């Protein structure tokens, strides 16, 4: 496959060559090379020419309808959209080497700093995502058009995310890695062998000498490091010969050691399947028959048919490593299991106080402890079975029932004994229940578990979220509608808050509930809806949205975008809590009061600080669509930022019950000094892999419209960017058939990129007439970590001039 012509400096070419060499030898890569992903086409396609200007590179192209096939592993064969992929055999694994196309699938987001760290001995929560074979809508790296996609957003309850499928090497789709990392959750792929074919595969790399299994381990580590996820679940679902099972512990030890060297915080987990004799014999516990595998890696994932006596026996086997034992809970409740479905919480137990979750705080009457959500219970799903059977068959059976099973049993027992938990296939609420009720069922399911799931805190700034789920019925950019129609883009999901419903006051008349909502958005496709009733005896209610443990710089800038819906006189304010109260000093005009040594209400700025006016010029103004932005500037010294809360207060003189509905569109907490630092510019934008097709409506005769597909590449320091917004002048995206051509002064938004490359697919453009040149300009807008917009003059750009064949 030939690539478009490019112009890059010699230094950039040398840097790319060093990077590819580093991928072949991971231990030689520097941190700078790890952060600077800039794939480049290397050869000139015949018939193309370029010229350089001071501000843009111009590419010339003669339209041709000749096929230019792309490798099907990396691109969808029907649309040429980039896709995430898996490896199906040992041969594919050993033959894998990084290619330029792999750059689409490399995670942009590093694993966010969190407290407590994953290495702590607090019991953890693992989510094993197994849905209908995997690689569904989530495989489209740049997003897709989906009416009712699956979404997971209770990230603060989760410590480890495993992407599971029945392919030999399951590489997590990059959207899951980006989203999980943003929330401080580590991501594992799956290495699985099954049936007779799996037995032959294991014999091929385990029955020989150490070089064979070390080659497999080295390749798994290289894949982990290149795609920037965090490790592997090893699942051997077939019997092993004595020679092969004898080499399994050394293989696990070597894999774990090498992964720890190359991927800080990396994890290797073993699934309870094979025993040390080589038999495939699920134990449902850690015991003397499988302990050797646990001792050779980072953790043990038990099978699901355990009873409390299994947990009691494991206490002695696990010793001080109880948190490294992940007790499996099948949410589908297949087999002879404890809990499952809406009974899943019965397998967990802990004495931990629900005050570590989201709480309501009525200021007049102290702290109101939240009450668990009490869901309506219905009969068990009739498609359940005590047999071990195919997930696909189960899904087909249960997916047609539409019956909601019964209430919470199994997590209770796991927490009682101090073990970690592995929730298998919680997508049950999506697969087996009505799609139209998905969000209600998702919140119900996780709401019943929340008191058993310790949360973790994000501990770094900047902290910015628009509450976007990475999906929506339309796409909005800072209050301005960009496109109408359903969309789904996993990498675009932003940091999600603590969710729940809680009762306030002694008689329970007051309540507050938070949930995500696709009906309106400030930025992205969704917002956070907070509804509640302030009872007469309560003055105001503070809703804790985020748990943080972030050291803060001397001065921070905060912003909140919100709108109140319906007639109400309730007021809204942003609050924060700080730690290290003995040495923490807070100052600045925005601090209104400090009722305790650590909780602070903030007074909005009337005008933005002069130095920050370029970024925060909307402060205190009514925005489009009824949104309001409040800005704050706070001076701090020796402080730790612990919580972000939103406070709802009754109007002065009110003695009645006050109800409110508030939509939160964005919250920002950034180092004020970082807003003054210059942002690097997007450089070396190139165009390659161009494909032309006649418009679908004009397959016969000379077309007036063409469909253009091409790939953009550019250079940028990834550590300073959240994502890139891709635009063009002149053209109409085929994904939005009802959208008019943009006004000349407005470039058209095409999509989001979370890498330094982007595939444009089926963009409608005017055909060039005889002797004519048509012009398309592509623009790459960097979105800085702080979340503000960059002036258009600082975007990267490249021009495509195309003409009809002579």
PLM feature segments, named:
Residues 2, 10-13, 118-310:
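Chitinase-like catalytic core of GlcNAc-active glycosidases
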Residues 60-87, 97, 330-363, 388, ...:
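Substrate-binding cleft of secreted/luminal carbohydrate-active enzymes
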Residues 161, 528, 542-574, 628-636, ...:
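Extra-cytoplasmic beta-strand recognition segments
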Residues 500, 510-544, 586-620:
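Short carbohydrate-recognition loop motifs
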Residues 560, 608-673:
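Extracellular beta-strand ligand-recognition surfaces/modules
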Residues 705-720:
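Conserved aromatic anchor
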Residues 761-791:
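Beta-strand-rich modules
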Residues 785-805:
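Extracellular fibronectin type III
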